[in-house]
Amino acid sequence: MDNFKMNFGSYKHSTGEYYLSNVRMGLLVAMFSIGCAIGGLIFARLADTLGRRLAIVIVVLVYMVGAIIQISSNHKWYQYFVGKIIYGLGAGGCSVLCPMLLSEIAPTDLRGGLVSLYQLNMTFGIFLGYCSVYGTRKYDNTAQWRVPLGLCFLWALIIIIGMLLVPESPRYLIECERHEEARASIAKINKVSPEDPWVLKQADEINAGVLAHRELGEASWKELFSVKTKVLQRLITGILVQTFLQLTGENYFFFYGTTIFKSVGLTDGFETSIVLGTVNFFSTIIAVMVVDKIGRRKCLFIWCSWDDGLYGHICKYRG
């Protein structure tokens, strides 16, 4: 976006154009991911101290503060830089707390699909982001990049309003010895009476799980690396899955898509980004529909095999 480059880039006298250096562009993009990583770590604890709903409201407010700092930036790339980090802190907190609340309030038979729905909404948000940028790309003022950022407030407000309507996690309430509220929450989620025998049974099962967890005592970081259990094996598996997912390079296209598409000769990289976002969204819909039917591991194997085939085809074509 030309106006964005004019505000936060450097002027090149030889061409008479503004540009973003590779270092500055890399920092502006990377700081969001770094903020997400830090936010996921530091805000996760709020779920146990303040409750899932209030914790989500707090991280969304942090997200909004980051957006305000970015929108108010004017010819100060370092201000935008700071806003990007804070923006990421809020997004990282949401990425931990929202699936946590979903998994604890969702009915058992819908839990997998609803947690997957979180990822679906993320891909839909990416698609809407591409559309908003496409719609403002021809503006010749700061609205070119401020409008897409400003739209983030809409999604943040929807989350905050949603937290007023969603019941608190029954598990959190039982952990706080608020058993009556926990039963009311279970009843509201399943649209039955708080005195229903099924509600009482569910509350007892959650309470038993909480008590069993307490009997195990506080876990230590050292236990993560113990070879006496399978915790280390699961930890390594989880880390490797996420690591290899990033190494496939898919996020490279999401972050630098318009630049990449223009560099290979496409006239409008913004249109191609919308196509990418559309494919990403509908692929996630398929995953949500089948995850509970064929299982998580099998889904992972199928999609990884599909990716391998596509990458092999690309390598053969390029060769």
Role assignments for model-derived ranges:
Residues M1-I189, W198, D204, A208-G319:
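Alpha-helical transmembrane bundle of multi-pass membrane proteins
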